[in-house]
Amino acid sequence: QSNTLFRINPYSGYEMGSLDVRHALASSPVYLAFLSKMTGLHSLIMAHIPYGIVLIVIYYCMIYSAGHTLFDDEKDSKYISVFACMACVFTICGNISSSVPQTFMLMRTWQGKAVLANICIPAAFLYLIMAAKTVKEDKIPLGIYVMLGIAGLSATAMTTSGAVFIPALAVGGMLVISIVRKEYWAILK
């Protein structure tokens, strides 16, 4: 252990001359190291136990929010719990391969790709669904734009592919919503 961040190449053991772009954007390892230093826990223990538990709780809160958004009518509100339970069963029983999102969420929670696939992308879709439900209103509420931005920033902090994927998803979704609204400048309102 060298007590430094991104100064030594983990593959060769030599000091790095400059920080590569891949690690410059994804700051989740730095945050994990900060939490480890502040709590006194080893970074491996921090990543596997407290950090993983918090991310799994956020994941299940995201599932409940998706159910609440999809079944927002009074008559459909009883299906929110059914949706959340079914999603939890699919998550628990979805461990059929090492590369499916369910395995990423429960077995490799601390990795940035798991957070991107299970929290950031569903959050972006959730906020796009919320924006699509405002078709009858004059304009999309500012809070939806803010939450889409937060989903994009958190995806960027987790993995560098999130820096491209979530903004592209948000722009594509807003483009579809503006076409449905027949207001081609609705994104800027």
Question: PLM features: residue spans?
Answer:
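Active-site lumenal/periplasmic loops and adjacent helix-entry segments of GT-C-fold
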Residues: 1-90, 94, 99-110, 115, ...
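Hydrophobic alpha-helical transmembrane segments
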Residues: 46, 81-85, 145-150, 187-188
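Hydrophobic core segments of transmembrane alpha-helices in multi-pass, intramembrane catalytic enzymes
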Residues: 56, 117-124, 166-170
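Membrane-interfacial entry segments at the cytosolic side of transmembrane helices
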Residues: 75-77, 140-143, 182-188
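Specific aromatic-rich, kink-prone transmembrane helix
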Residues: 110-135
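Membrane-interface alpha helices of multi-pass inner-membrane proteins
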Residues: 144-160
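Perimembrane helix-loop-helix junctions
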Residues: 166-188
